[in-house]
Amino acid sequence: MEESLLPVYIHSAEYVELCDNVQSKVPRRASMVHSLIEAYGLLKEMRVVKPKVASMEEMAAFHTDSYLQHLHKVSEEGDNDDPETLEYGLGYDCPITEGIYDYAAAVGGATLTAAEQLMAGKTRIAINWPGGWHHAKKDEASGFCYLNDAVLGILKLREKFDRVLYVDMDLHHGDGVEDAFSFTSKVMTVSLHKFSPGFFPGTGDVSDIGLGKGRYYSVNVPLQDGIQDEKYYQICEGVLKEVFTTFNPEAVVLQLGADTIAGDPMCSFNMTPQGIGKCLKYVLQWQLPTLILGGGGYHLPNTARCWTYLTALIVGRTLSSEIPDHEFFTEYGPDYVLEVTPSCRPDRNDSQKVQEILQSIKGHLKQVV
């Protein structure tokens, strides 16, 4: 593939507006992210592609018809106390809001559009920052996720690429994606996440390794609060080096949730965009077709800072430290700079424990045939 192929950036005004209005957990986040990327002049370094909207049939590649039909129904009629609603995981952390089905179809369609660009050889890197909703199950919404666009993207890529690697750097375990592929050896899932009693979703211990034919094809890296860039990168590189050699992927899907960044209301990890960027750079040097998704990130200016920095890294641009004037400029006070400073929180990741986890993972990967 020609190196001159520009990265693809999935975007349309309608898509951003839908994400802004329906994502009640992160209102206007999609606009903030896009505006900062645009303000730094990064759009001209990419090919902007308008996303399609996923059909019910396309979403049913993973989700059950009954779940999708119920989501469609409550999206139009509102929640009429239907007992099925709770069974489908709707309510609580996945509130029913008007237009939720259209939003799910838009995010799913955007990730499918990105995957199709990669499959057609039109680019080597395709980005859908409003995507990455990794908790949704086949017939159940979960953890703010109504549709698992990451799974849909992987399934689409599998139509062309025999082995697809999924790497999840969100603060939370990528349980929905792991579950979807836990029985196959064609998709390896790697998740680095906080693992602590009572912390959602409560899965993803190092001993969770997949089932049946997929045994040893689920890789979990359970981490504790306070981890910073250097240690995170050492762990990430150590795991991905082994994974790449063992699995030999043909395409990669990366979920880069920004709830690991210092200042996030989750108050857990203590990362900066540079730390995540180093991990991203490591994956990109494989020169494989790579689909990039967002995910969590509840400190909205820091999420925009993070994904803008990562976008610049992808296109090979160094950004000025000063936030450029744009629609959301006032949100970046009091210092109005791109950098995020780690807090003074202690790192709870004991070096010996981390080494034990890495040894465990290496042992599991040796079992991969």
From Swiss-Prot:
The active site is at H135 (proton acceptor). Its activity is inhibited by trichostatin A (TSA) and butyrate, 2 well known histone deacetylase inhibitors. One of its GO terms (cellular component) is chromosome. Residues 5-316 are annotated as: Histone deacetylase. It is found in: Nucleus; Chromosome; Cytoplasm. The keyword Mitochondrion does not apply. Keywords: Chromatin regulator, Chromosome, Cytoplasm, Hydrolase, Metal-binding, Nucleus, Repressor, Transcription, Transcription regulation. It holds the Pfam family Hist_deacetyl. A divalent metal cation binds at D170, H172, D259. Its EC number is 3.5.1.98, 3.5.1.-. Binds 1 divalent metal cation per subunit. It is an enzyme of class 3 (hydrolase). InterPro entries: HDAC_PDAC, His_deacetylse, His_deacetylse_1, His_deacetylse_dom, His_deacetylse_dom_sf, Ureohydrolase_dom_sf. Substrate binds at D93, G143, Y298. It catalyses: N(6)-acetyl-L-lysyl-[histone] + H2O = L-lysyl-[histone] + acetate; N(6)-acetyl-L-lysyl-[protein] + H2O = L-lysyl-[protein] + acetate; N(6)-(2E)-butenoyl-L-lysyl-[protein] + H2O = (2E)-2-butenoate + L-lysyl-[protein]. Belongs to the histone deacetylase family. HD type 1 subfamily. This is Histone deacetylase 8. It comes from Xenopus tropicalis (Western clawed frog). The gene is hdac8.
